[in-house]
Amino acid sequence: MAYSIYVIELKKEVLKHRKFKEANPNYIPGKPCVYVGYTSKTPEDRYEKHKAGTMISAKYAKKYGFRLKPRLYRVHNPMSSRKEALAMEKEKARRLRNRGYGVWQN
């Protein structure tokens, strides 16, 4: 089974949530806010599930997500294991935070 990471751009309104702001103390105003995840589906399929509300643990992606950002994840996909995808999800989130992005991941 192949796995992928994906990045969903979030509307800036997500910044009004205390938990999101606390998770991103080095956020640079004007930089994108994103949700980073991994999946055994295609990133497009997973995005549709988020928007349909079937991903309970990803409320920010459902409420504030408005598009995929393939240029931020395409180079990493596909991966051969869940473990590899989870590690890459964490690494991608770390890298984006280091660039001043607002990032949410579960």
Where are these regions (language model features)?
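GIY-YIG nuclease catalytic motif and its immediate N-terminal context
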Residues: 1-48, 80-90
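Aromatic/basic micro-patches that form nucleic-acid/chromatin recognition or nuclease catalytic surfaces
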Residues: 41-44, 48, 55-106
